[in-house]
Regions:
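Conserved ABC transporter NBD signature motif
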Residues: 74-83, 91
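Conserved ABC ATPase "signature" region
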Residues: 127-145
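Conserved ABC ATPase signature
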Residues: 149-153, 157
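Catalytic Walker B motif of ABC-type/P-loop ATPase nucleotide-binding domains
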Residues: 174-177
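H-loop/switch region of ABC-family ATPase nucleotide-binding domains
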Residues: 206-207
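A short, surface-exposed alpha-helical micro-motif characterized by mixed small hydrophobic
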Residues: 212-214
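Conserved beta-strand-loop-alpha-helix hinge in the C-terminal portion
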Residues: 226-248
Length: 251
């Protein structure tokens, strides 16, 4: 059964070609470790891209810059709006970041309260909040879970609820860190089908190269804080020398 398309990018984004634009982004941690070196790339409206590379490549660090959790030197734009301290709340509503561990995202007693948290803090009327929650739960095929206790769910169910918590904000860009990690085959397949059907621009960091091959038309390869390749997924996966040099395996 296809998911509902009631979850869609915010109206301001529909006519914007570049949903995401990163220009010459550099970042070093307080201990002096340099994690990002001149990262630049764009994503178009509706595009789905995989972000791959070995552990320590800088993938998670990059993702934490896209909604302002970390702030380096360079520029990040979402829908033509540059990320600054003044517009940080608006940017965070536009960028739905889903962490690898769903327990980092689910902290309310019930599923409904978790998914409603963002819209409530936007100051929306109760009726609008309920509508957003129902649409988000329907989109991740969890409509019957609204009154369940979040901490009693399976890992796969928690990951879908974590996605719903950001979908309820009607984001323009969905950013996921290792979404298939720790899932059994059935839960993994359910997740892949969900990501395929969601009508939203998507950047997904993953080591699951089989999912990359199946789901993403574009693949960005990172290593040592740099983008070392960016192209069509078939071309990237056919380049065995590239994969070997950067610790990746052909699916």
């Amino acid at each position: 059964m296809p998911v509902s398309h009631s979850i869609s990018p915010s109206p301001a984004m529909i006519h914007t070609a570049d949903v995401l634009c990163v220009r010459d982004l550099h970042f070093s941690y307080p201990d002096g470790h340099s994690a990002l070196h001149g990262i630049s790339f764009k994503m178009n409206n509706g595009e789905k891209a995989a972000l791959v590379g070995p552990n320590g490549a800088g993938k998670s660090t990059l993702m934490l810059h896209l909604n302002g959790i970390l702030g380096g030197h360079g520029e990040v734009e979402i829908g033509g709006k540059r990320l600054t301290r003044d517009n940080l709340p608006a940017i965070r509503a536009m960028v739905g970041l889903v962490f690898q561990n769903p327990d980092d995202q689910l902290f309310s007693p019930t599923v409904f309260e978790d998914v409603a948290f963002g819209p409530l803090h936007m100051g929306l009327p109760e009726e609008d909040v309920r509508a957003r929650v129902e649409a988000a739960l329907e989109a991740v095929r969890m409509s019957g879970y609204r009154d369940r206790l979040s901490h009693h769910l399976s890992v796969g169910e928690k990951k879908r609820i974590a996605i719903a918590t950001v979908l309820s904000m009607n984001p323009s860009l969905l950013v996921l860190d290792e979404p298939s990690a720790g899932l059994d085959p059935r839960a993994r397949r359910t997740l892949i089908n969900l990501l395929r059907e969601l009508p939203i621009t998507m950047l997904v960091s993953t080591h699951d190269m089989t999912m990359v091959k199946e789901l993403f038309p574009r693949t960005i390869v990172m290593d040592e804080g740099k983008i070392v390749a960016d192209g069509s997924t078939p071309e990237i996966l056919d380049d065995e020398k590239l994969l070997t040099e950067h610790g990746l395996e052909k699916p």
